[in-house]
Swiss-Prot record:
HAMAP family: Cas9
Record GO biological process: defense response to virus; maintenance of CRISPR repeat elements
Application in biotechnology: The simplicity of the Cas9-gRNAs RNA-directed DNA endonuclease activity may be used to target and modify a DNA sequence of interest.
UniProt keywords, alphabetically: Antiviral defense, DNA-binding, Endonuclease, Hydrolase, Magnesium, Manganese, Metal-binding, Nuclease, RNA-binding
Name of a matching Pfam family: HNH_4
Record-stated family: Belongs to the CRISPR-associated protein Cas9 family. Subtype II-A subfamily.
Residues at the catalytic site: 10 (for ruvc-like nuclease domain), 843 (proton acceptor for hnh nuclease domain)
InterPro entries xref list: Cas9, Cas9-BH, Cas9_PI, Cas9_REC, Cas9_RuvC, HNH_CAS9, HNH_nuc, RNaseH_sf
Domain notes from UniProt: Has 2 endonuclease domains. The discontinuous RuvC-like domain cleaves the target DNA noncomplementary to crRNA while the HNH nuclease domain cleaves the target DNA complementary to crRNA.
Subunit relationships: Monomer. Binds crRNA and tracrRNA.
Protein name: CRISPR-associated endonuclease Cas9
Entry's Gene Ontology molecular function annotations: DNA binding; endonuclease activity; metal ion binding; RNA binding
Stored CDD domains: Csn1 (cd09643)
Length: 1334
């Protein structure tokens, strides 16, 4: 008889815990065969384990390398096209000129022609370098001279311009003749005063006076931030977040955020240097009005003048080649300053002369010019050298202005706009076309080599198929800047670009999402927010708005006002509903959503009757889509022509100038396509009219009484005909979480194969912390920087009075002290920084309702303040006393909006029974789409058979569980999790997931729709909306394990018995567990990318085929694909066979796998034979069960798991939590101090047997003896850190009683040759062994 079993999964980003358990809560156990070289032919194994693996990485590095390759290739192509244009004429002048240029990189004896790169003779070469010390000398001469020049010189100048053509940050024409910062800043001030004339008249804004000091500040070599601060000081009364400050931010090159100054709903950042500046500005002007356009033009002109002033340093009348002349001036100044510096050093610091001017290893001039020294390091070195030396003021002043000994090629050359280079190119062509007619004929082609960029919607010009390209051709042949429109189908490529760029709906993975500015999407956002807004009438009755009222609000407010405020809604209630003193709940000062696109389209001239007519919905949605996808005005114009029969030319012209950004999360089909089977209404229909219930989107799609949930499940991508790899690849989510999902699916497949039949239940838990996004990781980085900025804005001196650092701020107690500006959050009294352990860390929303240990839910307060607050959010009395202070913290960025809302929740009725039920429900029921996707894949893999009526037959229950339930279970029964001890906790969690899920569904079968994927009960097991009943029910679920000794159903079946706890505890103490680290054949880059200089090193890899590293340098540190153990013959007369480990690099892998024997013979091995292939993390076992994992061909990692008795795990749990406010953990470790000696004895015994780091162990024992009577908190932290000593994996250094214990590295791999290699399946249930000492 097949016994039912459950698979529990705990899925993470670098681990998957799994467990297979019976109905009686024990693990399945079997004797499993061991194949290969093993004395034991079978081992009894518990069916639980952990799959460990390296976290999946994003493709960011690959993408950057690909982008760099394309950029370099396109640069080479531009030069090649220029040579093609010059080829015929150049062959008449110097037939070998281009050959010599292409050979110029090679060493002399490998060049095909003359060893001189430019000219055939040494005399010409010397003459050229004498006349033109830099390329800019040549460019300037050709721009200013009308005489005929050598064609080779013309080519060299044009090639330099085209190769380094400048940036495209400033679009359109650039007025290089007018770079007077002072004059243009005056124009900006005049425009500012004109635009804000009405504000100046009514006193809300001040009239600004021109200040000559501003121009001086703008051109100074100081940071943008310092420029902004100094300019604002010249205008007293102007605030850093004010209107004027934002325009000055634009001018100095920073972001201007106009959200607050213009009172906008969304953040509105624009930056002059950004490619998208024009589009961003148009979007902003659409919100604030075109009357501000002239002011932004004035600000952009001022910004351009500042940029150009930093590049062009020569007077306007001196030359027509201002850029080249400025570079020549930089060269001449460098030469003069260098002469003066040398003379000064010889006179005042003769002993330093050699170091500064000859030693390239130092940060002196030699290192700066010929070594790797950066400008900042050179300046720092020279300043330190010259300080306090009489007469060095001149040099130090230039260093401080960053204008000392500047090189020709510097980082700020990236700021040179392409228009400056273009101006010189056009001048050279104009001067020389008189003598070389082909230049005139090809003028546009040559110019296009500077100005042309491949349109973004065309994408890479791939040859053949490419996973990154979507280009559609009109005609075959080579694509050039001047023929691209003949060769490429812009329209079709643009459509394909739309498809490629559009994201998929979170809920309906086949559907494209709507643009963020879609009228339909904005309508959904408005109604989704409005449906949860309540009002209290004059009689004190609280009501939601009816469907009719919502429609009226939408038409009378949102269609009339771009931004709807709370006071507008109050006025509406007074006028329409005759409520004299309404109180609005569920809304701050204004709505977050708006119907802004409607107003934009009205403004460009589309009539209201067109906008309001449902017949035009599709047209209007298409218009918004075009304006979102395309940035190119010509492309927008072309795409909009399809609507010319409805919209006139004037309207279309205005639409061309508009551009939207951003995409929503939902599709049109989700909002308006799928319909409830009974009512035939869409989700948007319900949002507009859901009288009595007023459900929002999440409630509608999760409501068991509606069919949206089942429709969404059926719409999920089918997995029937796809392999697991491609199924997971199609999921929305990070590469890290996808890798975990893929591993978990493979584990389930193997477990089902071993068991021989499917499980009754599969329980899936995905911990939230395992879905950390890039943003999340950034947010968790060092706290000091953000704190310092916020404290400064807040105007506090607390960081100066009590300095701290990132290490200290990891302590939440101290971090909260600074975030609260040293004040008790509930009482306002000063906190004593020296006695922070005496205060409580309080959860604003109590832990009994929500497991939220984030800073957003924590405050530091006295015990008295905590008691006054009680087991609820802060009462109204505390809110009224402290709200002003909390608002200051919120405005000063020391508190998030979420935290402020938690603290002030009493103003909005406090924690209602419905809130409490919702908080607890949120901890129980998994709502994340990524988890539902995993459940869907498992559901489709096992529940694919249909009954006679076509309904899915459910063979396997797929249960999604949240970690809160298992956490509660662990807490109640002291089954403590200490992650630092070993990796067992992943499998423990998987096992407990199975225990909790099975028991819950036995005791509360009505919970199946909440937990089991694909279950829909078409009734509400809480009649009406009894929030109190729901809250009590959910609370009981969280606590029933502790409250009930035995639960029996009506048939007498025991559903839960406390004796089962003994089984659970026994299982949790099992020592045998299958830990498997995923072996990896390494792929990717061949070696480190850094090119090493030429040298007599056999280790260097040639940069290209036939490039001798001794002549051209090379690459080092080749990356290993895997290692191999080989056997080969040694000796002359008598052959002796030896074994050796060698690495096969990623670069060599293909050749090795093609013919292993030939490859090894080429390496010099006689009669070679491959004994074993060893990918990274291959596991091998030495004497007494000591295990290691291969890290590289010459280093290993620890391979054993340390297991501690339960009482020592309990000790470590309390040690890790001794800072918690209730003091229980601190009391525990204080009263069990002597147990730390026992813990150390266990660690020492394990280390002597497996870790083998004797010197470190002796040091650890000595430190313990010296500190064992010391501060108990220091002991606790030291022993938590000590767990790293024996942890499986790469050795790591750690601190023990503030002393660093350095890592012990395992570099001697000779023992591997006498070990047993262990090959494991993904679960570790199957294994085979191979002895290498035979």
């Amino acid at each position: 008889m097949k016994k039912p079993y459950t698979i529990g999964l705990d899925i993470g980003t670098n681990s998957v815990g799994w467990a297979v358990l019976t109905d009686q809560y024990d693990l399945v156990k079997r004797k499993m065969k061991i194949a290969g070289d093993s004395e034991k032919k079978q081992i009894k194994k518990n069916f639980w384990g952990v799959r460990l693996f390296d976290e999946g990485q994003t493709a960011a590095d690959r993408r950057m390398a690909r982008t760099a390759r394309r950029r370099i290739e396109r640069r080479r192509n531009r030069i090649s096209y220029l040579q093609g244009i010059f080829a015929e004429e150049m062959s008449k002048t110097d037939a070998n000129f281009f050959c010599r240029l292409s050979d110029s990189f090679y060493v002399d004896n490998e060049k095909r022609n003359s060893r001189h790169p430019f000219f055939a003779t040494i005399e010409e070469e010397v003459e050229y370098h004498k006349n033109y010390p830099t390329i800019y000398h040549l460019r300037e001469e050709l721009v200013n001279s009308s005489e005929k020049a050598d064609l080779r010189l013309v080519y060299l100048a044009l090639a330099h311009i085209i190769k380094y053509r400048g940036n495209f940050l400033i679009e359109g024409a650039l007025d290089t003749q007018n770079t007077s910062v002072d004059g243009i800043y005056k124009q900006f001030i005049q425009t500012y005063n004109q635009v804000f004339a009405s504000g100046i008249e009514d006193g809300s804004l001040k009239k600004l006076e021109d200040n000559k000091d501003v121009a001086k500040i703008l051109v100074e070599k100081v940071t943008r931030k310092e420029k902004l601060e100094r300019i604002l000081k010249l205008y007293p009364g102007e605030k850093s977040a004010g209107m004027f400050a934002q325009f000055i931010s634009l001018i100095v090159g920073s972001k201007g955020n106009f959200q607050k100054p213009f009172d906008l709903i969304e953040k509105s950042d624009i930056e002059c240097a950004k490619d998208s500046y024009e589009e961003d500005l148009e979007s902003l002007l659409a919100l604030i009005g075109d009357e501000y356009a002239e002011l932004f033009v004035a600000a952009k002109n001022a910004y351009s003048a500042v940029v150009l002033s930093s590049i062009i340093t020569v007077a306007e009348t001196e030359t027509n080649a201002k850029l080249s002349a400025s570079m020549i001036e930089r060269f001449d100044t460098h030469e003069e300053d260098l002469g003066e510096l040398k003379a000064f050093i010889k006179l005042h610091l003769p002993k330093h002369y050699e170091e500064i001017f000859s030693n390239t290893e130092k940060h002196g001039y030699a290192g700066y010019i010929d070594g790797k020294t950066k400008q900042a390091d050179f300046y720092k070195y020279m300043k330190m050298t010259l300080e306090n030396i009489e007469g060095a003021d001149y040099f130090i002043a230039k260093i401080e202005k960053e204008n000392f000994l500047r090189k020709q090629r510097t980082f700020d050359n990236g700021a040179i706009p392409h228009q400056l280079h273009l101006e010189e190119l056009e001048a050279i062509l104009h001067q020389q076309a008189k003598y070389y007619p082909f230049l005139k004929e090809n003028y546009d082609k040559i110019k296009s080599l500077v100005t042309f960029r491949i349109p973004y919607f065309v994408g890479p010009l791939a040859n053949g198929q490419s996973e990154f390209a979507w280009l559609t051709r009109k005609a075959d042949g080579e694509i050039r800047p001047w023929n691209i429109e003949e060769k490429v189908d812009f329209g079709k490529s643009a459509v394909d670009f739309i498809e490629k760029m559009t994201n998929k709906d979170t809920y309906l993975p086949k559907e494209n999402v709507l643009p963020k500015h879609s009228l339909c999407y904005q309508k959904y956002l408005v109604y989704n927010e409005l449906t949860k807004v309540r009002y209290i009438n004059d009689q004190g009755k609280t009501s939601y708005f009816s469907g009719q009222e919502k429609e009226q609000i939408f038409n009378d407010l949102f269609k009339q006002k771009r931004k709807v405020k709370k006071k507008d809604l109050e006025l509406f209630l007074r006028n329409m509903s005759h409520v004299e003193s309404p109180t609005i709940e569920g809304l701050e000062d204004s709505f977050n959503s708006s119907y802004s696109t409607y107003h934009d389209l009205l403004k460009v001239g589309i009539k209201q009757e067109i906008l309001d007519n449902p017949v035009n919905t599709e047209m209007l949605e298409n218009i918004v889509k075009i304006l979102t996808v395309f940035e190119d005005k010509r492309m927008i114009k072309e795409q909009l022509q399809q609507f010319s029969d409805v919209l006139d030319g004037v309207v279309l012209k205005k639409l061309e100038r508009r551009h939207y950004t951003g995409w929503g999360r939902l599709s049109a089909k989700l909002l308006m396509g799928i319909r409830d089977k009974q009512s035939h209404l869409t989700i948007l229909d319900y949002l507009m009219n859901d009288d009595g219930l007023n459900r929002n989107l999440m409630q509608l799609i999760n409501d068991s009484n509606l069919s949206f949930k089942s429709i969404i499940e059926k719409e999920q991508v089918t997995t029937a005909d796809k392999d697991i790899q491609s199924i997971v690849a199609d999921l929305a989510g990070s590469p890290a979480i996808k890798k975990g999902i893929l591993q978990s699916l493979k584990i389930v497949d193997e477990l089902v194969s071993v068991m021989g039949y499917p499980p009754q239940t599969i329980v899936v838990e995905m911990a939230r912390e395992n879905q950390t996004t890039g943003k999340g990781k950034n947010n968790s980085r060092p706290r000091y920087k953000s704190l310092e900025k916020a404290i400064k804005e807040f105007g506090s001196q607390i960081l100066k009075e009590h300095p701290t650092d990132n290490q200290e701020l990891r302590n939440n107690r101290l971090y909260l002290y600074y975030l609260q500006n040293g004040k008790d959050m509930y009482t306002g009294q000063d906190l004593d920084i020296h006695n922070l352990s005496n205060y409580d860390i309080d959860h604003i929303v109590p832990q009994s309702f929500i497991t939220d240990n984030s800073i957003d839910n924590l405050v530091l307060t006295s015990s008295a303040g905590n008691r006054e607050k009680g087991d609820d959010v802060p009462p109204l009395e505390i809110v009224r006393k402290r709200k002003v202070f909390w608002e200051k913290l919120y405005q000063g960025n020391l508190m998030s909006k979420r935290k402020f809302d938690y603290l002030t929740k009493a103003e909005r009725g406090g924690l209602t029974e419905a809130d409490k039920a919702r908080f607890i429900h949120r901890q129980l029921v998994e709502t994340r789409q990524i988890t539902k996707n995993v459940a869907n894949i498992l559901h489709q893999r096992f529940n694919y058979e249909k009954d006679d009526h076509g309904n899915t037959m459910k063979q396997v229950r797929i249960v999604t569980l949240k970690s809160a339930l298992v956490s509660q279970f662990r807490k109640q029964f002291q089954l403590y999790k200490v992650r630092d001890v070993n990796d067992y906790h992943h499998a423990h969690d998987a096992y407990l997931n199975g225990v909790v899920a099975n028991t819950l569904l036995k005791v509360y079968p009505q919970l199946e729709p909440e937990f089991v994927y694909g279950d829909y009960h078409q009734f509400d097991w809480f009649k009406a909306n009894k929030a109190t009943a729901k809250k009590q029910f959910y609370t009981n679920i969280m606590l029933f394990f502790a409250q009930k000794d035995r639960i029996i159903d009506e048939n007498g079946e025991i559903l839960w018995d406390k004796k089962y706890l003994d089984t659970v505890k026994k299982v949790m103490s099992y020592r045998q567990m299958n830990i498997v680290k995923k072996t990896e054949i390494q792929k990717g880059e061949f070696s480190k990318a850094t090119i090493k200089p030429k040298g007599n090193s056999s280790k260097l890899i040639p940069r290209k085929t036939n490039w001798d590293p001794m002549k051209y340098g090379g690459l080092d540190s080749p990356n290993m694909a895997y290692a191999v153990v080989i056997e080969y013959a040694k000796g002359k007369n008598k052959l002796v066979f030896e074994k050796k480990i060698i690495r096969v690099t990623i670069m060599e892998r293909k050749a090795f796998e093609k013919d292993e024997k030939a490859f090894l013979e080429e390496q010099g091995y006689r009669q070679p034979k491959v004994l074993a292939k060893l990918p990274k993390y291959t596991l091998y076992e030495c004497e007494e069960g000591r295990r290691r994992m291969l890290a590289s061909a010459n280093e290993a990692q620890k391979g054993n798991q340390q297991v501690l008795p339960n009482h020592l795990v309990t000790l470590l749990h309390h040690a890790a939590n001794c800072e918690v406010s209730d003091g229980k953990s601190l009391d525990y470790i204080e009263s069990n101090r002597e147990m730390f000696a026992e813990l150390l004895a266990h660690v020492s015994e394990f280390a002597k047997r497996y870790t083998l780091a004797e010197a470190n162990l002796n040091k650890i024992n000595q430190l313990f003896e010296q500190n064992k009577e010391g501060d108990i908190k220091a002991i606790a932290q030291s022993f938590v850190d000590l767990m790293a000593f024996n942890a499986m994996g790469a050795p790591a250094s750690f601190k023990f009683f503030e002393t660093t214990i350095e890592r012990k590295r395992y570099n001697n791999l000779k023992e591997l040759l006498n070990s047993t290699i262990i090959y494991q399946s993904i679960t570790g249930l199957y294994e085979s062994r191979k002895r290498l000492d035979d």
